A protein has these predicted regions:
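Processing junctions and N-termini across compartments
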Residues: 11, 15-18, 249, 308-312
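Radical SAM enzyme [4Fe-4S]-AdoMet core and its adjacent flexible, acidic
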Residues: 32-38, 46-50, 130-132, 136-271, ...
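A cross-family glycoside hydrolase active-site/sugar-binding cleft signature
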Residues: 9-11, 76-78, 103-107, 128-132, ...
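Flexible mid-to-C-terminal extensions adjoining Fe-S/redox cofactors in radical SAM and related proteins
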Residues: 1-6, 27, 31-36, 274-375
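Conserved alpha-helical substructure of the radical SAM core
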Residues: 1-122, 348, 367-370
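Receiver (REC) domain switch/active-site residues of two-component response regulators
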Residues: 100, 125, 192
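Short cysteine clusters
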Residues: 17, 21-24, 255, 273, ...
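Flexible loop residues that form catalytic
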Residues: 29, 80, 132, 199, ...
Length: 375
């Protein structure tokens, strides 16, 4: 019998984007041959979602099979840039009623007023928008041209004025860290709808972009001003973890994300972690997909990913907004603090996360008891 999960992170056409972020993780992944050294600098491919399109047949099946197997109340759809797909809004409309929350990650450039109006009408959409800074220097690893950056910010401002809940995903690098305080002050204008989640640049090429040791005090200084920016920030404990990551030079704290969220792709590939695409666990579009999904949560890789101390090199460099789930499981934040974020605010998600934590604690207690008896 399959376990219940919180969410499915569905990645659509991950190698197709309208921006060319220098630190893009797709080309740093070993999951697929198509990812190898592929930093998405080629022209994006044309694709379409519609009744007779191959993409529609695939992603409809991926979403349905994962939801039916793991009873997930949360669907996150990301890319690439998903709005490069003609008709993507129709897929999102198909999925919205099936979930407690539909999380849509985008760089915002192709989001239209029609999209925003339809999102509002569904009532359960959270937008996760990628923007490292409102100023060009801090966002220049994403958008090197100042004129294009200005257009990107203009589009994102429209999203922030839409009334929809927005989580800003901001990669901290040696350029953006200089502008954290200015950026947060700018975002405060939209405090009724926005949450600001800064997190470290990741991946095997992160060394080129990560904040320098002499810049860590800039993060310390930002955290010292937590109260000034509190209306748009995650819990204070999030920044305690972030500072620990920087001061210790790597992740040393436990991750629970793979026990809660799984990652799938529009070609059907399944991998256990939404943060780092470690391994191909099988394909949910195969006729025997149930056998592949039966392995979820039970393989040696899962044991390594969920170990009390991070064991894999890739995990040592990982810290993302998903970490608030781990923080709740580790009693670093309360359920109320976790669910203040719009992604986890719906009552069914709140109840499920609390139950999954209790189930895990009971299993941990049983395991400890077995170990004691064995001695």
């Amino acid at each position: 019998m399959a376990i219940q999960l919180l969410g499915n992170d569905l990645v659509v056409n991950e190698d197709s984007c309208n921006l060319s972020c220098e630190y893009c993780l797709t080309g740093q992944s070993n999951l697929k041959q198509s990812h190898h050294q592929q930093l998405i600098f080629q022209p994006p491919k044309v694709d379409r979602y519609g009744d007779d399109s191959p993409l529609a047949q695939r992603i409809d099946a991926v979403s349905d099979r994962m939801r039916e197997t793991f009873d997930v109340p949360l669907l996150k759809v990301t890319g690439g840039e998903i709005f490069l797909v003609k008709g993507m809004i129709d897929f999102l409309e198909r999925e919205a009623p099936k979930y407690s929350v539909l999380v849509v990650q985008t760089n915002g450039v192709l989001v239209t007023e029609e999209h925003l109006e339809r999102f509002r009408s569904w009532g359960n959409v959270v937008l996760q928008v990628s923007l490292d800074s409102h100023l060009h220097h801090g966002n220049s690893y994403r958008v090197p041209q100042p004129s294009l950056h200005a257009k990107v910010v203009q589009r994102i401002e429209r999203i922030l004025r839409s009334g929809l809940p927005v989580e800003i995903y901001a990669v901290l690098n040696d350029r953006s860290v200089v502008e954290m305080e200015d950026y947060a002050a700018w975002l405060l204008r939209f405090a009724d709808v926005v949450s600001y989640f800064p997190f470290p640049v990741r991946g095997p090429h992160a060394e080129q972009y990560k904040i320098r040791p002499d810049q860590i005090p800039l993060v310390d200084a930002f955290v010292d001003r937590y109260d000034d920016f509190a209306p748009i920030l995650p819990p204070r404990a999030y920044f305690a973890r972030l500072l620990r990551f920087y001061h210790e030079g790597k992740r040393t704290f436990r991750c629970h994300v793979p026990r809660l969220v799984i990652s799938t792709f529009s070609d059907g590939v399944v991998t256990p972690c939404p943060n780092i695409w470690f391994s191909d666990m099988g394909n949910v579009l195969d006729d025997d997909y149930e056998a592949s999904l039966e392995k979820v949560g039970k393989t040696g890789l899962y044991q390594a990913l969920l170990d009390p101390k991070p064991r894999l090199a890739a995990c040592h460099g990982c810290f993302t907004p998903w970490d608030t789930l781990s923080m709740y499981f580790e009693d670093e934040i309360t359920l109320d603090e976790l669910c203040a974020a719009p992604t986890y605010a719906p009552e069914p998600i709140r109840k499920l996360v609390a139950r999954l934590k209790e189930d895990w604690k009971l299993e941990e207690a049983r395991a400890a008891s077995r170990d004691t008896l064995a001695v």
